[in-house]
Amino acid sequence: MAKVLYITAHPFNELVSNSMAAGKAFIETYQQQHPDDEVKHIDLFETYIPVIDKDVLTGWGKMSNGETLTDDEQMKVSRLSDILEEFLSADKYVFVTPMWNLSFPPVVKAYIDAISIAGKTFKYSAEGPQGLLTDKKVLHIQSRGGYYTEGPAADFEMGDRYLRTIMTFLGVPSYETIIIEGHNAEPHKTEEIKATSINNAEKLATIF
């Protein structure tokens, strides 16, 4: 039995968001095809994720030295630890994001910072950093109003590129994407684009 974290980063649901519609189709099909697997939904817009700030950095330093943390430091450090442990407990990750300003919502970066921890998801060695998530799988579903997979705007895309890079850095060997794009550039194709993405999501769910 595998554990899947379904990690969404959109303020709207599948009735409004193309990425959330594809994500919903993927998860529903996945659960039908893998009834024994556990799926946990993490809505990043409804989840408290401490940013790495002065309290967190000071708290980590105090922990290393065996010193007592303040209440705020303890609360933030403990919450980050819980997020990390939940991430480590899973076998597969499905990220659902929109493209915002060429990347993704800031809550995604906060979550990535929470799970990118030396000694846990990667380690330093004489040969350089080494990823420790060598038995995990990732799917990224992202919706973009324009066209960024290829063409003149391709070099501007920083969301999927960053997520793929950080997951490779963490050692993840399998990274899949479902990219939904062009519905703002060609509004007359909106329903066709959405239907294609849902179909692609359902197909991938059977083998993911």
Swiss-Prot record:
Coiled-coil regions listed in the entry: none
Cofactor(s) it depends on: FMN
The entry's keywords: Flavoprotein, FMN, NAD, Oxidoreductase
Domain of life, per lineage: Bacteria
Cofactor binding: number and manner: Binds 1 FMN per subunit.
Enzyme class of the recorded protein, top EC level: oxidoreductase
Binding positions (FMN): 17-19, 99-102, 143-146
Keyword NAD: yes
EC number: 1.6.5.-, 1.7.1.17
Reactions this protein catalyses: 2 a quinone + NADH + H(+) = 2 a 1,4-benzosemiquinone + NAD(+); N,N-dimethyl-1,4-phenylenediamine + anthranilate + 2 NAD(+) = 2-(4-dimethylaminophenyl)diazenylbenzoate + 2 NADH + 2 H(+)
InterPro entries to which the protein is assigned, alphabetical: Flavodoxin_fold, Flavoprotein-like_sf, FMN-dep_NADH:Q_OxRdtase_AzoR1, NADH:quinone_OxRdtase_FMN_depd
GO molecular function: electron transfer activity; FMN binding; oxidoreductase activity, acting on NAD(P)H as acceptor; oxidoreductase activity, acting on NAD(P)H, quinone or similar compound as acceptor
SUPFAM superfamilies: Flavoproteins (SSF52218)
Entry-linked HAMAP family: Azoreductase_type1 (MF_01216)
Subunit details: Homodimer.
Family indicated by similarity: Belongs to the azoreductase type 1 family.
Function: Quinone reductase that provides resistance to thiol-specific stress caused by electrophilic quinones. Also exhibits azoreductase activity. Catalyzes the reductive cleavage of the azo bond in aromatic azo compounds to the corresponding amines.
NCBIfam families per UniProt: PRK13556.1
Protein name stated in the entry: FMN-dependent NADH:quinone oxidoreductase
Organism for this UniProt entry: Staphylococcus aureus (strain MSSA476)
